Structures are given as C-alpha cells and as structure tokens.
C-alpha cells in the first residue's frame, strides 16, 4: 500500500516535507489559519463524538479535536506523514482518543456508512484527482446531521493568483521553484461553486470564512485576500 501511494508525485512531495510539517504548523501564519478554521465550530460540544481527519498529515489538527473530547481517526496517503503523526501524539492528549492510519486515498474510505459525527478535511481536496468522489465518500461515512469542516484554495484570492504567477516564473529557471506545493495543488473554487458542489453530494453549507495568508487578520479574512476558504457544512438527513 505504501509503495503504491509513493508512486504518486503529490504523495512523494508530502513525504519529502513531512519532517518539517509540524514546525510549519507552529508558525504564526499556520496558527492563524487553524484558528480561523476552528472558529467556524464555535463552542459546539464535541465531547464523545467520533471524528475523521481526512488527510491528517502529522496529526496537528487531529490532536486539537481530541483536546475537545473527540475520538479521532486520522488518515493520510503519505506514509511519512502517518509515521510522524504516530511518533508525536504523546503531548498530553489521551492516546486512546487518537488513531492514525495510512490509506491509499480518501476517495475510497475504509469505514462503514455513517461511522462519524464529523469529518475534518483541511487543505486536502486540492491534491486529489477526483474531488467529487472524495465528497461522496465523506458524505457516506458521515451520520445524518454530521458536520464537515473543510478548507480549499480560494479561487478569488488575488494573493493566491500572485503566488501562482511567481511559481510559474520561478519554475522556468529553478528545479525548486517558489511555492512548490502549487505544482501539485490543482483544485480551487469560490464559495458559490463549493456551495453547489456540496449540495450535489447531500451537504448543506452552514458558514464560510477566509484565511491562509501571512497578512494581519483584518486583511487575511477578506474574500479577495485569504488564500483559503474555510467551510462548515452539514450532511442532510
């Protein structure tokens, strides 16, 4: 399974960056984007709920959910990310609340229907070849009324557009261009487009927000600036 996953360039890229992923998540920009995403949950009581972190990386956000009382299963296609997640979970969070598994893709989730009260999918869908198939799987494993907390690249972000231009220009002169992740990050959308896509898969958008840039929150959370759209949605009955 791990060998098959490593055949895909986006997985090899995430394997390569796994050793520095946790450090990156502790940066001011990443802490701000995580806070903006979790703000959509507000003070919701998650104690005792079962959540899936679909594309968990090194488990940073899985541990935040576990700290709120969730039993969290984190899955990722990158073997190195999962190895790091397993090695870093002893941080005060009860170990029994965290399970990490390497799987080939979130387009085929190895869980029964209606298994989870919530699904977290943070900056993952842009790297998968079939977003619709992944959303169908997320819908399948969510219980009716269950929540999806998801972030995807903001198509309307002027800052993201400038990143893409810089990536394209630097790719012509360097084997390690600026914003390397953009070589693998393909999917982006507007809030309206995501609302329609979610609706097609039995999910109702409840709230949205913007984040992801290194700029102060007053700018970062503007629709034309934030490089990510954060979305809270609910599975219909």
Positions of predicted regions on the chain:
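A conserved beta-strand element that flanks and buttresses the S-adenosyl-L-methionine
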Residues: 120
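Conserved class I S-adenosyl-L-methionine
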Residues: 1-46, 48-57, 60, 64, 92, 149-172, ...
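Class I SAM-dependent methyltransferase SAM/SAH-binding core
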Residues: 58-107
């Amino acid at each position: 399974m791990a060998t098959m996953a490593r055949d895909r360039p986006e997985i090899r890229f995430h394997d390569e960056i796994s050793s520095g992923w946790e450090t990156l998540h502790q940066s001011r920009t990443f802490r701000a984007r995580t806070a903006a995403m979790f703000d959509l949950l507000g003070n919701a009581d998650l104690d005792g709920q079962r959540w899936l972190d679909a594309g968990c990386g090194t488990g940073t956000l899985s541990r935040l959910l576990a700290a709120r009382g969730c039993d969290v299963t984190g899955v990722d296609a990158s073997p190195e990310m999962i190895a790091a997640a397993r090695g870093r979970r002893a941080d005060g969070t009860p170990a029994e609340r965290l399970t990490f598994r390497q799987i080939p893709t979130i387009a085929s989730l190895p869980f029964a229907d209606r298994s989870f009260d919530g699904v977290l999918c943070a900056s993952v869908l842009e790297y998968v070849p079939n977003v619709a198939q992944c959303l169908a799987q997320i819908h399948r494993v969510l219980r009716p009324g269950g929540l999806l907390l998801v972030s995807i690249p903001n198509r309307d972000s002027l800052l993201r557009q400038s990143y893409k231009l810089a990536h394209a220009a630097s790719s012509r002169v360097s084997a390690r261009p600026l914003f390397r992740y953009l070589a693998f990050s393909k999917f982006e959308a507007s809030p309206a487009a995501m609302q329609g896509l979610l609706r097609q898969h039995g999910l109702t958008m409840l709230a949205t927000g913007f984040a992801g840039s290194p700029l102060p929150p007053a700018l970062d959370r503007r629709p034309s600036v934030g490089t990510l759209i954060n979305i809270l949605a609910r599975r219909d009955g």
